[in-house]
Amino acid sequence: QKLDQVAIPDFAMGAMENTGLVTYRETLLLLDPIAAAPDERVNVATTIAHELAHMWFGDLVTMRWWNGIWLNEAFATFMEVAACEAYRPDWERWTSFGVERSGAFDVDSLDSTRTVEFEVRSPADADGMFDVLTYQKGGALLRMLEQYLGEDRFREGVSHYLRSHAYANTETNDLWDAIEATSGEPVRRIMDTWIWQPGYPLVHASLIDGSLRLSQQRFRFGSAYTESE
């Protein structure tokens, strides 16, 4: 029932979400209340919100294996923005998140991109999961799902997920099960394509003889449009 937040001199990492004791690099927790620049305030608030989110996503409920690390980090990324948006709407964190997300779009447009979740067989594979696809793309997918379901139904599903798996391990299917159970929506059918397929779609619209025709393909840098599915 107690949570301490500690600034540590020369802390190698940015911050670490130990249960009940979050440790930070000094510059990510301590601010001059008078002289701190607006960007510093946003950065500190974002970091604190991210680490506090891990008390639920990562500590209370932990992924079964490293392939599911997005369940921890994408939720923490989503919650850091949502919390700051509620705390200081004037910061417009969802707007700035759109800029942050662009880094994931860039990576996801390469032929060498990966899926959000893939089989982890080695420490190197696990280390490779900590990138913009896990954090920014994963957070953007959760935001997309929230906007599809509506804030209340999304929150109800996530709460059911946390309550059902408290102090236990989960995988992505457990999240979809929980949200489907409370919302009645085909969440797995919608979201699995985003989690298990690389890239993102480019939708092409054309007007042919008075009829609107829609098609899509995976977007790639330097690729000319060719009609697919």
Write out the residue ranges for each language-model feature.
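Hydrophobic alpha-helical and helix-loop surface patches within well-folded domains
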Residues: 1-217, 221-227
